[in-house]
């Protein structure tokens, strides 16, 4: 129990998919919690000189509970993991369970803004959009450029955000 019952990416990546289909109210509560702590995620992004929102790697109350260390702090894929789980839940249940669409739109827009500010078009790569200095799910291969999982999930996050955009998107 090294994580002491805290929320972290495993919640959305491994636990939430099961509950989405077997106990939707439980999955909904996980995702609503992420909506509830969005202001803290916005504060965290600002602390790291990023736009939008960056959810904490590990939390119990919306604040980052892990000590700062580069490999952990660079696990930005947490944002995409949350949006991917949220999208899966909404695709499965639509509006049947009353998820607040304004919160959905804001979560999507703010996490998309984080990716836009984290990545950059790099001239020596042919001006491809790169997301550098990140740590993917393999915590033992830390601080790399263009981690495949991170880049794939960032793309998913951006595409979901466009598809679910509303008044919050710009």
Where are these regions (language model features)?
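Solvent-exposed loop and edge beta-strand segments that line ligand/cofactor-binding
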Residues: 1-10, 66-78, 138-151
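Well-ordered alpha-helical scaffold segments within catalytic/enzyme domains
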Residues: 13-25, 81-96, 114, 118, ...
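Helix-terminus loop motifs that line ligand-binding clefts
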Residues: 25-84, 88-102, 107, 111, ...
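Hydrophobic (often cysteine-bearing) scaffold residues that line and stabilize catalytic clefts
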Residues: 10-11, 23, 27, 104, ...
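Acidic/histidine-rich catalytic neighborhood
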Residues: 63, 110, 114-170
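Long, hydrophobic, well-ordered secondary-structure blocks that form the structural core
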Residues: 1-11, 17, 33-39
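Short, flexible loop/turn elements at secondary-structure junctions
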Residues: 13, 20, 35, 59-61, ...
